[in-house]
Amino acid sequence: MGKHNHAHIEASGVPLAQAARDALEKAGEAWTDMRAQIFDAVAEIGKPASAYEIADIVSQKRGRRVAPNSVYRILDLFVANNLVRRVESANAFVANSHPGCLHDCIFLICDQCGAAVHVDNDRLSDEVRAAAEATGFAAERPVIEVRGKCAECQ
């Protein structure tokens, strides 16, 4: 895995915040100052962060308290529009470095430093969906989380 990725550039070379803004506006949603600040906070943290941690960061930048429930609503909008991914086991969020890609969530989560790397593996996702379908289960949002130690922490 190499070094932790703290890049704020989307794969196409567009700044990540601009790619997120473009995707949200394409979906018919406004890119407000609050949404921009929340997205920037998620992207800058570089590892899974709770809504409370994000609210604290945004509150400091705004100079006034931002309620975690407001942050949750915006994070839910971001998740629905593929701008942010939810790390289910930690009830935390990470910026999606590829807002235009629609892949299932596969995370490699470091138990030591907390970093989470999102991996795209359509073959594995297809296998999980097929296994679910074989049992009559309609998978809507497969999430796979693998816990261990990243290359930096080994």
What feature does the model see in each segment?
Residues 5-39:
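Short alpha-helical segments that sit at the start of domains
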Residues 23, 40-45, 57:
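Short amphipathic alpha-helical elements of helix-turn-helix/winged-helix folds
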Residues 31-33, 44-50:
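Short capping segments at the starts of secondary-structure elements
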Residues 50-64:
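DNA-recognition alpha helix
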Residues 71-81:
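Basic amphipathic alpha-helical segments that dock to polyanions
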Residues 79-154:
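Non-DNA-binding regulatory cores of transcription-related proteins
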